[in-house]
């Protein structure tokens, strides 16, 4: 069957629907997770995912994402174009059916989409429901179609033909503006769009994705012929690798059970000399941050092949020695990407994959190709095994230290660590922990705080660089030990968010480069050992003022040079203007520290979130202070 015949076979009869759109505007969080920053950007990806599905089906090669000056988003692809014929049930065009009926889409019909990132017919209708303006253009069958919707998915008029195109010219173009009567009035962030688009390009080898910020006349183009091999290379940029090769495994597996479907597996692996891991997994281009069966299969393969190789080549010192899953992680950078016809996810956020055959497929395909690689490259194989055994020794030593520390711990709010001055409230939701640079500022913060809800933990020494030190060294650091004890959650695999004692963790450092560096070191530790604190939005960065500007009548604070000049221009007629530049938090008395940096009514904070894993990893590996300073340009009152 020719490609043109396949295109013509995809029509209205392939569009199935399960229920209406009524609930979306009333309960948007059920469909996009939130109405804030994350949910707003999720609207883009629901549209883009449709275009990616066209690419995975073999019909699209190019996707464009455009950010317009009025905060409109436009997504264009060169896929087949939405079906335009009349749907047999709705008696409306297939375009209108897709855009106005929840759970309507071609993704239910496996003859048209072998693989997709979930039920994306849901997504495009939800975007329409949450937009005050939504336009669609379709090129299909030699004609150019257009339809507009307003106020949450109400069509202005039926789909109409507005022109003609070449018969081989196909595709879909969508332009929407969020309905800010429902969504939080937050602007789209071009950096976030770029980061996510780049991930999609890595996962779809050869797919071209461009992102354009029309206001700033900025365009970024992504196309990776190496796919996830290029992804691993990017994540290891600037690091010394254990072996020069990126081990790549790919294949297709089908279980022998009735009605089994193909599972396509792509995995890329490389070790570096650090003590942390970056394992990122995806199912049908959806990042599975909580792992799942494909990650289990990945570790099954690594531990089995590593142990077999070590035993066969007598690399173990005794018969009781075994490499565990935890021992394989230090320095491991891996991308795991599977494509499944019928992915089963845990929960609406699709954070965890549950298909049993994904575990079998990943294990089998990685095992075969990893075993062959190690047999053909014995020096590289030995280096990997030695890295795992070094990790094992560190892990056992750390476990012993952790057990000794555990015996010292008392009740949940008792036996306070270090110089922690705790607050009186026992309600974690209102409790705030200020991690303060220096004893002097820590003393002022203790005197100026709200003792009911604000706890102070001064940093007495330099925080360790968790990116460059092994587990044992990090755990031996007194400042780290104090933070772990104070927060109460544990770390890494033992981390329990339900035991968190403070729902605001505020990093309060000097407003200079040194302060930014200390903040970065703290963020690096949280990211590597207590990552959910960042992912769930519990970590904030305080923004203390740089200047105090006073006259006989008024006192104002400036947080940067531009703000200082703005204040001075307003006071130009005043006499005896006093300008004090704060070199550090310790120069403020308790009242000033409260007024400028700790008072919930006036303080300025940055809520630090890792919007995408790749962006977060890169921000901790490269350009440390520069990256953090960029993050700290957008502040949010708490």
Swiss-Prot record:
The lineage of its organism: Bacteria, Bacillati, Mycoplasmatota, Mycoplasmoidales, Metamycoplasmataceae. Mg(2+) 1 binds at residues 437, 510. GO terms for biological process: DNA topological change; DNA-templated DNA replication. CDD domains: HATPase_GyrB-like, TopoII_Trans_DNA_gyrase, TOPRIM_TopoIIA_GyrB. GO terms for cellular component: chromosome; cytoplasm. Heterotetramer, composed of two GyrA and two GyrB chains. In the heterotetramer, GyrA contains the active site tyrosine that forms a transient covalent intermediate with DNA, while GyrB binds cofactors and catalyzes ATP hydrolysis. It catalyses: ATP-dependent breakage, passage and rejoining of double-stranded DNA. Its main location: cytoplasm. GO terms for molecular function: ATP binding; DNA binding; DNA negative supercoiling activity; metal ion binding. It is found in: Cytoplasm. Binds two Mg(2+) per subunit. The magnesium ions form salt bridges with both the protein and the DNA. Can also accept other divalent metal cations, such as Mn(2+) or Ca(2+). Pfam families: DNA_gyraseB (PF00204), DNA_gyraseB_C (PF00986), HATPase_c (PF02518), Toprim (PF01751). Mg(2+) 2 binds at residues 510, 512. It comes from Metamycoplasma arthritidis (Mycoplasma arthritidis). Its cofactor is Mg(2+); Mn(2+); Ca(2+). This is DNA gyrase subunit B. It comes from the Bacteria. Its EC number is 5.6.2.2. The record marks 462, 465 as: Interaction with DNA. A type II topoisomerase that negatively supercoils closed circular double-stranded (ds) DNA in an ATP-dependent manner to modulate DNA topology and maintain chromosomes in an underwound state. Negative supercoiling favors strand separation, and DNA replication, transcription, recombination and repair, all of which involve strand separation. Also able to catalyze the interconversion of other topological isomers of dsDNA rings, including catenanes and knotted rings. Type II topoisomerases break and join 2 DNA strands simultaneously in an ATP-dependent manner. Residues 431-545 form the Toprim domain. Few gyrases are as efficient as E.coli at forming negative supercoils. Not all organisms have 2 type II topoisomerases; in organisms with a single type II topoisomerase this enzyme also has to decatenate newly replicated chromosomes. InterPro entries: DNA_gyrase_B_C (IPR002288), GyrB (IPR011557), HATPase_C_sf (IPR036890), Ribosomal_Su5_D2-typ_SF (IPR020568), Ribsml_uS5_D2-typ_fold_subgr (IPR014721), Topo_IIA (IPR001241), Topo_IIA-like_dom_sf (IPR013760), Topo_IIA_B (IPR000565).
